[in-house]
């Protein structure tokens, strides 16, 4: 199946004659513990290695999203002393980011359903290398916003992030391996129940509110947000999207139209994990396959997140 990789490039415009620099808003490093949990046999990637890959692609800065949440995946073999392991993995990310603090910004991560999640968020909020934001992965954590208990827990997590002034980048699509429900209904729950708890912070929906593709469920969910933006719903005032997503050749025009409906000013670049076939240079090479106009490219490429 022919697929077109959509990647939105955000350029940070410096004053004067200095050329704009690319910022990657959806990047990961993986500890020796998280690496093989995420990808069998993989040792992970360090910040030194990421910087080298960024240099190759002429990426100036990146938001590094901790993958500590993967240690708390309910469908993976249990990790010994999980709570401590999650803390240590976030700390590993903090140390890695600190080595290149001029180019990397770290986001803490947790499984929001775990009883220690809020405690770990509060700890991260005091860490200068992680306090900018929080990464949540509803699919990996098997979050179901249609489950009242899950929703109650999520509202607390969003409230605490708002109190700590930590931006949230969230993979909101439900677990695909178990075919959890996801679409317009779940997007409305997110809009109506969760965004009000995070009214004062930036919330970024990863993968244009999908799981990486632009299937029917993602089309439905993203349409809910596009409609809310069109009617100037105050709940989406601080809502943004990273465009780290694939589409079939027939879906690509629809995806471009959705970007236009959302508004290019709300789109950030994101390349995801630097694995074979998806290194930063590969991601950039695919960018111009996507059908946007020169003006749209220019506008998207100059977006800068409020938390920078």
Model segments located where?
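Bacterial N-terminal signal peptides
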Residues: 6-16
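Mid-to-C-terminal alpha-helical segments outside catalytic/metal-binding sites
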Residues: 19-25, 29, 33-61, 122, ...
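Active-site neighborhood of phospho(di)ester-bond hydrolases with catalytic His/Asp-centered motifs
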Residues: 22-25, 64-65, 107-108, 135, ...
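Conserved, mostly hydrophobic/aromatic
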Residues: 26, 54, 93, 124, ...
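Divalent metal-dependent hydrolysis catalytic cores, especially in the metallo-beta-lactamase
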Residues: 27, 40-43, 48-77, 103-111, ...
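Acidic-and-aromatic substrate-binding clefts and catalytic sites of carbohydrate-active enzymes
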Residues: 34-45, 70-72, 82-86, 110-118, ...
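Active-site gating/metal-coordination segments in enzymes
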Residues: 76-182
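Catalytic pocket-lining loop regions of alpha/beta-barrel enzymes
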Residues: 131-133, 140, 146-268
């Amino acid at each position: 199946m022919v697929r077109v990789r959509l990647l939105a490039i955000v350029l940070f415009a410096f004053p004067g004659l200095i050329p704009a620099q690319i910022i990657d808003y959806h990047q990961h490093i993986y500890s020796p513990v998280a690496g093989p949990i995420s990808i069998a046999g993989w040792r992970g990637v360090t910040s030194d290695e990421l910087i080298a890959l960024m240099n190759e692609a002429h990426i100036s800065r990146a938001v590094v999203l901790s993958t500590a949440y993967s240690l708390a995946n309910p469908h993976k073999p249990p990790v010994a002393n999980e709570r401590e392991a999650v803390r240590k993995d976030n700390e590993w990310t903090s140390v890695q980011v600190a080595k290149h603090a001029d180019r990397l910004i770290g986001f803490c991560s947790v499984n929001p359903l775990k009883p220690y999640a809020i405690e770990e968020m509060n700890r991260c909020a005091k860490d200068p290398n992680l306090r900018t934001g929080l990464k949540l992965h509803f699919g990996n954590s098997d979050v179901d916003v249609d489950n009242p208990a899950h929703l109650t827990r999520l509202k607390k997590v969003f409230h605490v992030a708002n109190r700590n002034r930590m931006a949230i980048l969230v993979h909101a699509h439900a677990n695909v391996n178990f075919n959890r429900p996801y679409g317009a209904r779940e997007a409305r729950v997110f809009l109506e129940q969760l965004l009000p708890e995070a009214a004062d912070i930036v919330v970024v929906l990863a993968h244009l509110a999908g799981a990486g593709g632009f299937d029917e469920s993602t089309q439905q969910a993203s349409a809910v947000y596009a409609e809310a933006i069109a009617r100037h719903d105050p709940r989406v005032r601080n809502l943004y999207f990273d465009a780290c997503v694939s589409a079939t050749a027939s879906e690509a025009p629809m995806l471009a139209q959705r970007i236009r409906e959302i508004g290019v000013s709300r789109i950030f670049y994101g390349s995801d994990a630097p694995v074979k076939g998806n290194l930063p240079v590969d991601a950039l090479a695919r960018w111009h396959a996507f059908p946007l106009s020169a003006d749209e490219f220019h506008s998207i490429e100059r977006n800068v997140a409020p938390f920078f």
